[in-house]
Amino acid sequence: MSAFTQHTGIALPLNITNIDTDNIIPKQFLKITSRSNLGKYLFFNWRYLENTPHTPNINFVLNNPYYQNASILITRKNFGCGSSREHAVWALIDYGFRVIIASSFANIFYKNSFNNRLLLVTLSESEIHSIFQNIHIHTHNNNKLFITVNLCENTVSIKNKKYFFKIKDSYRNYMLNNLDKISLTLKFESNIQKHENNQPLFLK
């Protein structure tokens, strides 16, 4: 993924609390080692009918043509709870999501997301509720809701309304400069090499 400064996209509402990683991508798909093509398994058990796999559940929001090409997911508290599985982040990214906005996230999922440069935005419950209401109004009027997330200003903008969010400087740096832990470490490669060269012989 490229560096993230600002993104404008269609908002998709997933009005469910405590969505765990098994909901995001079920365990049977964890044997897949490639990050590509995981998007088709995103929310698999909700997205497809139980007794006829791969038959879309027309009542699930991801199958609503109205939200096709959505890139900003709006959801509720404790998103990404449950077991640690990086596949959950990979599936969200491969589907096309660039930003997830919720009132809280599970800690390990939060770290995995930023390591893969998926931006997570935390807003208050009341602010999340306001956004859901805004989406409902737009949908009722047959208008898609576009949201702009500006990481330089730490803002979420919906028309004339702005919400401000906080983010750790380290994670913000990852996103703005397209870094991960490996690329960040490689910035200090010369220092690491110098340290290794100065090690006593018995440590080499």
UniProtKB/Swiss-Prot annotation:
One of its GO terms (biological process) is L-leucine biosynthetic process. Its EC number is 4.2.1.33. The keyword Hydrolase does not apply. Pathway: Amino-acid biosynthesis; L-leucine biosynthesis; L-leucine from 3-methyl-2-oxobutanoate: step 2/4. Signal peptide: none annotated. It holds the Pfam family Aconitase_C. It catalyses: (2R,3S)-3-isopropylmalate = (2S)-2-isopropylmalate. One of its GO terms (molecular function) is 3-isopropylmalate dehydratase activity. It comes from the Bacteria. Keywords: Amino-acid biosynthesis, Branched-chain amino acid biosynthesis, Leucine biosynthesis, Lyase. One of its GO terms (cellular component) is 3-isopropylmalate dehydratase complex. Belongs to the LeuD family. LeuD type 1 subfamily. Heterodimer of LeuC and LeuD. NCBIfam families: leuD, PRK01641.1. Catalyzes the isomerization between 2-isopropylmalate and 3-isopropylmalate, via the formation of 2-isopropylmaleate. This is 3-isopropylmalate dehydratase small subunit. It comes from Blochmanniella floridana. The gene is leuD.
